[in-house]
Amino acid sequence: MMLGLFLLGRIFVLHKRYATVIGFDPGAQIEMVSILSWATPDTPIRESFYGYHPPLGFLIPRLLHLAGFSPEVSIQLVSFVASLLAFFFLRMTLRHIRLLHSPSGIAFLYITSSIPIQISVSTSVNLDVLILAMGSAVLCASVHLLWPSESFKDQKNQCPLPLRFGWSDPVIRERRWNAIIAGCATVTAIACALLTKFSGILLLGIPALAAWSQPFERGWWKRCSMGAVACICAVAIAFPYYYGRYYIREGRFIPLNTEWTAKDDIERSIVKRDEAPVRFLAQLFQPTAVHAAAGPTHTDYEVNRLSDAWRDLWIRNQWTGDTSPKALRVGLLYMHLFPWLIIAGGLFFLERIRRKAPWTRLGWIVVSFSILQVLALVQYIYRIPFAGYGPAKGLYILPTVWGIGYLAVSAFHDERLVPMRWRRHIPFIERALVGVVAVFVAINHAIPAY
């Protein structure tokens, strides 16, 4: 039922926005789809605004363009399919660790996949939804590779509160053929991400986190070695391209277009940053007055603020279009409610962090990877400190929705939240919580709240 509601919601959003161009730099991406081909996948790096990106994110919609679709619709359809792949790969991960049919797994899957920015990227012009889909594929493949399915007991007949799990560490690995398939899938997904956008480099952290968080007492080094080999193979596939196209021509492996399109502004911002680097970093974590003065849809173009990136997860940036009053009210509710859920869920997660239950160890991966995403955004802003360029975008850290959804669910994860005299009503609480998640999915797709 929930799956049907989710898919109908996605189809409804696609129907409503079909052939509508939404995005931060849609013209630049459309241009690359029009001029690149599989025979000539590169252009001079500085010739086009998006010419510095790796080519795969443009070549995939190019296939649809060759089939007769316009570049805009081709990109939109690729975004739609990528958003569904991100959902189904995450679903496969939960199925593998036997959480798919648990209340926690249901809530995590559908809350994470229905956060407003997730719905937005499913029909907009962007490359980041491809990175999210590939990241979800890497997570799925890494867990299949490093966490044998025999490790997990059947999790039927669970209550939403409490959610406790147990297992035994199997001595026998999965069949070798399954491990080979999972390893090849991990390598392929990471390599594709590296050839889609520079942020794909961060996906190398997922196999490492999966190996680090594995709950088995034996075989730890073996699993870490398997994860490391997968990452090395993926880097080996992408390295010749990075070396030949970027390092030889630009003198660095990751050139950014703002370094030449806004060179003077960047240099002035770097000088100002270097005068007080601690103050610069502190300002990132301070709230912006622009949201109160001009409205929450507006971005602070004077000082870089991570609060703008947080806003982007829930409310449309005015740069990409207008926001309806209903969508704004719903987005503001989420924007102010979820920090409290994250704090509460984080406390419960830290209390149980040493447990070897699959829910806890999944949290090790998704929470750590979300933190890694935020740290990478801070590093990016520090390198490109010109606030007028708007580097603090939530779109750049799209996989953080995993950590947000996980911690939000963890906020309701402790049986101590339920008074003793009410615990006989846990089956009713279970249905009520699933109903709340269904309402969340329906509202965000029906408005949609972005």
Feature map (PLM): residue ranges:
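Transmembrane signal-anchor helices characteristic of membrane glycosylation enzymes that use polyprenol
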Residues: 1-26, 114, 193, 231-247, ...
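Membrane-lumen/periplasm interface segments of specific transmembrane helices
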Residues: 226-342
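Extracytosolic helix-loop segments that constitute the early lumenal/periplasmic catalytic or substrate-binding loops
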Residues: 9-15, 27-52, 56-59, 63
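Perimembrane helix-loop-helix junctions
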Residues: 141, 147, 151-154, 162, ...
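Transmembrane-helix motifs of polytopic, lipid-linked glycan transferases
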Residues: 74-98, 137-140, 344, 348
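Short acidic/glycine- and proline-prone juxtamembrane loop motifs at membrane-interface regions
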Residues: 117-130
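Loop-to-helix entry region of an early transmembrane alpha helix in multi-pass inner-membrane enzymes
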Residues: 51, 55-59, 67-88, 121, ...
